[in-house]
Amino acid sequence: MPVFLGLPVLARFIGWLAGALIAYVAKFFTLGIARIALAISLFLGLIIGLNGLLVSYLSDLTSVLPPEIASAVSYVVPANAAPCLYAIFSLKAAVFIFDVKDRIIGYLDWNKS
């Protein structure tokens, strides 16, 4: 008879243990997914932001010059200077962004947490 009285306590303990285990696994996956989502959103934000910034800088650069200076510069600077500068700046931005991406991936190292 005393064995039957201990069954509810045993069931409660096993339920508590299973609940704690499920909560730990859910917390682990939730934090991992949140960290990955944060890293992806930061990476995409850097790419989109720097790309838009470079395009706006290069388009504003040509519209700021007075007409006399613009015609004088057109004799020296080739017609495809803006795309060339855009390619150079995009490469520098890409190197910076991928460096930041490596740092973010280093932050997301699973062995640290």
UniProtKB/Swiss-Prot annotation:
Top-rank taxon, per record: Viruses
Keywords assigned: Host membrane, Membrane, Transmembrane, Transmembrane helix, Viral penetration into host cytoplasm, Viral penetration into host cytoplasm via pilus retraction, Virion, Virus entry into host cell
GO terms classed as biological process: symbiont entry into host cell
Cellular component aspect of the GO annotation: host cell membrane; membrane; virion component
Location(s), subcellular: Virion; Host membrane
Record-annotated membrane-spanning stretches: 13-33, 36-56, 69-89
Membrane topology: Multi-pass membrane protein
Coiled coil: none
Main subcellular localisation: virion
Listed Pfam families: DUF5455 (PF17537)
Quaternary organization: Interacts with G3P; this interaction is required for proper integration of G3P and G6P into the virion.
Family: Belongs to the inovirus G6P protein family.
Protein role: Plays essential roles both in the entry of the viral genome into the bacterial host and in budding process. The formation of the G3P-G6P complex termed adsorption complex is essential for correct termination of filamentous phage assembly.
Protein name as annotated: Head virion protein G6P
Taxonomic placement: Viruses, Monodnaviria, Loebvirae, Hofneiviricota, Faserviricetes
Gene: VI
